[in-house]
């Protein structure tokens, strides 16, 4: 059976952190290219870091739709990361959900992942093959059309002299993780947070030891620019790959188990809300 987009109870309520009785389950559509599935899965599972603040571990799980599945990816009983390919899509990813109109409870969700995002917007070797002296490919014209002027231009002008295959793989992987983090955030009930661009100073932002734990920005619900280190500084993460402080706070507010006593519950909620302006 499918899975609701909620977790109601903990297996061991006496413990501060417990697995849920029933986790939120996402399915990767079986049409998703194999080379992208690992990054897609990683982007979903990273939300487990945020759910720990709500008292849950392993709150979210990911499975791959079997090739012989007897259910379609459009079946609303399943939360599916859909793989789509459109000629001129208006988005790289889209995370709609549907709710109970009486309670607001999120009942289910589908996430649309556009193939063009991975082929034209993050495969920089396709965009700049002439600079890199690589062979021509059929995607070249489409790549030029979909060029993002800001962060992608800055990336190439800074890094083209050291554009290794390892660098390309890491860049693509991080961009997929960031996109999936963002879209899953929508399905969990989080709106855009365009005030969360800044978290670290110009030194800490390139320290992977810091950003891999805290994120590059305060929230994955931002539209972040690519993070490019200047020539004299070792390159850190290009994109945020973990929920930020705001995301963890929002999940704690929305998914932590309420207390039975109304007065104590009100105090608990107010204590969480009082941290809304914390750095």
Regions found by a protein language model. Name each.
Residues 14-27, 71-90, 95, 100-102:
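Active-site-proximal, well-structured secondary-structure segments within enzyme catalytic domains
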Residues 19, 28-36, 91-190:
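Active-site-proximal segment of zinc-dependent metalloprotease catalytic domains
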Residues 22-24, 56-59, 105, 218:
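Loop/turn elements at helix/coil->beta-strand transitions in domains of secreted/extracellular proteins
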Residues 64-85, 90, 174-230:
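The catalytic-center signature of Zn2+-dependent metalloproteases
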Residues 31-59:
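Zn2+-dependent metallopeptidase catalytic core
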Residues 2-7:
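Short, small-residue-biased leader/transition segments that mark boundaries at the very start
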């Amino acid at each position: 059976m499918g899975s609701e987009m909620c977790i109601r109870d903990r297996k061991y309520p006496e413990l501060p952190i417990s697995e849920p009785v029933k986790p939120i389950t996402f399915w990767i559509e079986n049409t998703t290219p194999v080379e992208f599935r690992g990054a897609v899965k990683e982007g979903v599972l990273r939300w487990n870091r945020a759910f720990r603040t709500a008292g849950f571990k392993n709150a979210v799980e990911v499975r791959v739709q079997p090739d012989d599945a007897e259910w379609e990816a459009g079946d609303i009983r399943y939360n599916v990361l859909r793989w789509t390919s459109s000629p001129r899509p208006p988005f790289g990813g889209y995370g709609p959900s549907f709710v109970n109109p009486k309670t607001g409870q999120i009942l289910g969700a589908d996430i649309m992942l556009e193939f063009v995002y991975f082929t034209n917007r993050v495969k920089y070797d396709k965009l700049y093959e002439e600079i890199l002296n690589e062979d021509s490919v059929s995607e070249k014209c489409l790549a030029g059309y979909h060029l993002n002027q800001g962060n992608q231009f800055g990336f190439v002008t800074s890094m083209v002299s050291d554009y290794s295959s390892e660098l390309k793989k890491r860049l693509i992987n991080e961009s997929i993780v960031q996109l999936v983090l963002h879209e899953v955030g929508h399905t969990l009930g989080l709106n855009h947070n365009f005030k969360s661009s800044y978290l670290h100073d110009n030194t800490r932002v390139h320290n992977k030891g810091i950003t891999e734990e805290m994120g590059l920005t305060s929230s994955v619900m931002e539209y972040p620019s690519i993070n490019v280190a200047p020539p004299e500084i070792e390159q850190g993460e290009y994109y945020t790959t973990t929920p930020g402080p705001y995301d963890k706070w929002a999940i704690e507010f929305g998914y932590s188990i309420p207390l039975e006593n109304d007065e104590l519950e009100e105090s608990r909620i107010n204590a969480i809300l009082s941290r809304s302006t914390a750095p």
